[in-house]
């Protein structure tokens, strides 16, 4: 059985995390040549490339499996060392999360764990349709995703759903929808997406108004909080989680443009198996809080 030296795995991990050999060498306090030698040693052991040497480098499928193994080992080390970790460097916990969860329920859910445990969070923000891929690639140890199926050697639990409403300010609605929200009016009303792969508003408009993707003017803004600001200031109409704008809806600062219509996204919590003690704490915290504030029906 091939048993990699974890020093060599850490070199592979550093090249991916630091997006290059030079910064990886600085991170590990060794020469760039030494980093290359360690990765070459790993590749010789497995008889295949573990890195695609692009800019930035990315792991091959086998490289992804090895990085996932490293993540599990790091967490299990924490499990076995237990109280001996007290006073040492806090455990790094890398999680892939969607921006809307981060802007609404995720941080309150993690608050008890952060207050009670010596960990350093590394939250990698990605669309909920793509967070699971970060877990597959071994970049993180847990992911909030819309995918219900667990990856091999992983666990999954349902968190609950975010309900998205199509909203705007009242002045925006009066300007663009004086006769109500119609297909013709929507063609002129600007919307906003998180990135070029965010299809939330496109799916909603196509399903309910038969508007094909790309038919409405669209801003690109990588911030959930900015969606709320853009809607409040009358710049756009957009899809925002109801949980994020309860106060604005109650005060009338924002209005639901399409009462009775919404877009529901069920969220799931994925992580490696077996779980370490620390990951079990994270899982319990996310499930307990998620089941309180997210839709369960």
Swiss-Prot record:
Superkingdom field: Bacteria
Keywords from the UniProt entry: DNA-binding, Transcription, Transcription regulation
Gene3D superfamilies listed in its UniProt record: 3.40.190.290, Winged helix-like DNA-binding domain superfamily/Winged helix DNA-binding domain (1.10.10.10)
Keyword Methyltransferase among UniProt keywords: no
DNA-binding region(s), chain positions: 21-40
Residue span(s) of domain HTH lysR-type: 4-60
Keyword set includes Transcription regulation: yes
GO MF annotations in UniProt: DNA binding; DNA-binding transcription factor activity
Subunit structure: Homodimer.
PANTHER family documented for this protein: HTH-TYPE TRANSCRIPTIONAL REGULATOR ARGP, TRANSCRIPTIONAL REGULATOR
Family membership: Belongs to the LysR transcriptional regulatory family.
Purpose: Controls the transcription of genes involved in arginine and lysine metabolism.
Protein name (database record): HTH-type transcriptional regulator ArgP
Gene name of this polypeptide: argP
